[in-house]
């Protein structure tokens, strides 16, 4: 019986199949590689996309975080050095058996330093989010920005970013009176204030209103994103600073230096991660409510040809 006809250059049936590569999404016209396609995103898309921002531009992202975050972390470590040095296992046991538990022995830092740390960390996050918004928005528009350009934009918009942060946290404080959970409402409404300040070039008050307008129609989804980011941030933070906490508990010398270094190292990862989610969430909301993906595609399609 004659063999079945086989088309020229065809693959034999028993030939092994080669795996199909799945490249990362790239912007049209050979632009920068994107962390996630510009489309409606799920919470896993936002979390994974934020990590991909760090992978795609580690020098720029970590450089921005280092310039903004490292001085703050070292300052806070030095400010709290005595309380950190006193927070060790031996002191805790001595006070427990003597009945004289002190604030220093139990690692209490006092209300003042703690409040200052919260404010400075919040301002750092706002400024880093502004810088990342400029970087990532540029990618989706087909433009690559240098580390120097990102840092300049972040600090140029630092004043409105700081004022917007204060406005948001005043609202959170008002909502939290008598009910801690109430702070989640403004935290959700104003989750994309920093990206709005930089991407749209608007002032703090307009950015607060703009964020509220974008998030209000998807309150549940944005709240879920906020809670997911908080959970991941807490888990990663504990993992990254765990060794430093053990070092402090053992009462070894130079505990405040180790604590400051661990906090600074954790900030280089966690701050860009949280900021990156805020940036991608801002883009997601604009895609859903305003068709940002269609607008950018039309701009590229009908852009005038270069002379």
Annotate the PLM regions:
Residues 1-307:
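Hydrophobic alpha-helical membrane segments
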């Amino acid at each position: 019986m004659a063999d079945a006809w086989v088309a020229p250059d065809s693959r034999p049936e028993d030939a092994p199949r080669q795996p199909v590569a799945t490249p990362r999404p790239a912007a049209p016209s050979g632009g920068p590689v994107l962390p996630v396609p510009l489309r409606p995103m799920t919470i896993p898309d936002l979390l994974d996309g934020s990590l991909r921002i760090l992978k795609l531009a580690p020098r720029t992202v970590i450089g921005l975080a280092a310039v903004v975050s490292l001085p703050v972390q070292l300052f806070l470590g030095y400010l709290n050095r005595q309380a950190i040095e006193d927070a060790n296992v031996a002191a805790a046991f001595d006070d427990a058996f003597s009945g004289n538990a002190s604030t220093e022995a139990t690692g209490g830092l006092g209300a003042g330093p703690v409040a200052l740390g919260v404010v400075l960390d919040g301002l750092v996050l706002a400024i880093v989010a502004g810088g990342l918004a400029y970087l990532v928005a540029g990618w989706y528009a087909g433009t690559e920005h240098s580390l120097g350009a990102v840092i300049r934009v972040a600090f140029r918009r630092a004043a409105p970013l700081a004022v917007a942060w204060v406005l948001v946290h005043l609202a959170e404080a008002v909502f939290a009176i008598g009910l801690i959970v109430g702070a989640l409402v403004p935290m959700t409404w104003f989750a994309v204030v920093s990206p709005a300040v930089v991407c749209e070039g608007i002032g703090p008050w307009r950015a607060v209103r703009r964020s509220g307008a974008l998030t209000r129609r998807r309150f549940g989804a944005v709240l879920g994103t906020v809670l997911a980011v908080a959970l991941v941030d807490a888990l990663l933070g504990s993992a990254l600073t765990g060794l430093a906490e053990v070092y402090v508990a053992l009462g070894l010398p130079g505990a405040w230096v180790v604590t400051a270094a661990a906090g600074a190292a954790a900030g280089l990862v966690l701050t860009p991660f949280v900021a990156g989610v805020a940036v991608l969430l801002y883009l997601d909301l604009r895609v859903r409510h305003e068709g940002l993906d269609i607008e950018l595609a039309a701009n590229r399609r009908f852009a005038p040809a270069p002379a």
